[in-house]
Amino acid sequence: MMEKNENINVEILTTSDMHSHFLNGDYGSNIYRAGTYVNQIRAQNHRVILLDSGGSLAGSLAAYYYVIVAPYKRHPMIKLMNRMHYDASGVSPSEFKFGLSFLTRSIALARFPWLSANIEYNVTKEPYFSTPYCIKHFGDLKIAIVGVTADGLMENEYSEMEQDVSIEKTLVASKRWIRYIHEVEEPDFLIVIYHGGLNKISNSTKNKKASSNEAEKLMEELGVIDLMITAHQHQTIVGQDHETYYVQAGQDAKELVHLSINFKKRTTTYDVESIDSKVIDLNEYEEDQELLDLTFYDRKAVAYWSQEIISDKGLMLSVNGLQDLVCQTHPFSQLLHDAIQLAFDNDITCVHVPMNGEKGLSGQIRNEDLYHAYPYPDKPMDMTISGQNIKDILEYSYSHLDFVNEQLSLTIIDETLCTMWQGFNYEIDMNQEPGQRVMLDQIDLTKSYRVTMTDYCYRNYKNYLKNAIIHESYDETMSTLIAEKLRDPNYRISCSDNFVVKNR
């Protein structure tokens, strides 16, 4: 027990959005260097809290491998974070990309809690990840850590989970749980891990999704947060808003934020005397050999798989900008149509641009190349929708494009929402007003059609597809089906010129 007026220092170390970057060397992961720094701090002071704000399980080639290729193996990021003795992690929406079974299995092997107060069981409304907060004791000093996830980021993330999981408004859940923590636990210091961003950053970027960057609102309306750890915007920042400190620790373990908090003992409580913060450039530290040894075979397996050749036919499927895909059937989009038909034998197929800045494929194609062309785990769905649904989806994307002198000049849409259809002919007249540009041939707007599209399309256009009938979801991902097509020695790409865009 400390005497009155004595001081105590607590070191808080935080990482963010590490995206399973555990491959070292040319891949540049700094988690092994972070291990060295954390060990140095622990050697100087045993009062250390190591936190991650979420986003550690998905978002890289290595993450894809451990979900799609080797799902039976323990996730290397969990092994690393266990060995580094993380105290808690927030929960990112990206953690749900590969489904609940993967996420639940990964978290079950973690020796630290995953915290999110507003991700709940759909039926009972209890927190999905057990208790959404934890308490760290240093003598009679009590530090509470609670996690919340930006509800705006959770929208459209994974359709499979909706029958099991619901998302409460971040602000509502935060108020309820923080009030509970203060009344029941009476902590000396409260940390909120918020997997969402700062509005002041989002105002200068294209990412302005509602309810995604509410850190300032939480700090202002709750008023009892001592430290807020934010995430998702992939920037490194340290600041103060009224009485609350806030930090964000970049991405991919490139940097680490270190806060040294000095507490002074009062009669029955502790006061914060000072908070010193610094951003740690991890490139200045050597990699921790124990951590490297821990993932040696994991890294070797991913490296071997990534270089496996899928096709050496010398296919030319390069994409030189969005215009290549939205103005005519491109060999790359034809490959997507051919692949998705392996799942369900429907005449009508809908595919979308796999990623912003899509480059396509060319030459010798390895697993790594295919991942970079189609990095997301989209899965085909068999459904019945109306002709009007088809028109509405096409109208949406072409209403957000503009052409000048036959060149695409303006894109005010996430490129992955641009869809390409086959199974009927259609024409886009960019000279018409938005919402009146699409003409469908052989499609009756009042009739229903059996269609194959990805779960990504379904989630993001669900407001148009409220009356859709879902028949079946396919187990394998689009990239797996694409690889199957590319490996077929008899496969030849033959483009179906079924749509035209008038942009003069």
Segments the model singles out, each with a brief description of its role:
Residues 71, 202-212, 294-297, 304-305, ...:
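Charged, glycine/proline-rich intrinsically disordered loops and linkers
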Residues 9-11, 21, 27-35, 110-118, ...:
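Feature captures C-terminal
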Residues 6-7, 263-365, 486-504:
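A short C-terminal boundary segment appended to hydrolase-like catalytic domains
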Residues 14-21, 313-322, 464:
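Acidic/histidine-rich, surface-exposed loop or edge segments in extracytoplasmic proteins
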Residues 136, 288, 438:
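Short aromatic-centered micro-motifs
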Residues 162, 324, 378:
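Conserved short-loop catalytic and cofactor-binding motifs
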Residues 2-284, 327, 331-339, 472-477:
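Acidic, metal/ion-coordinating pockets
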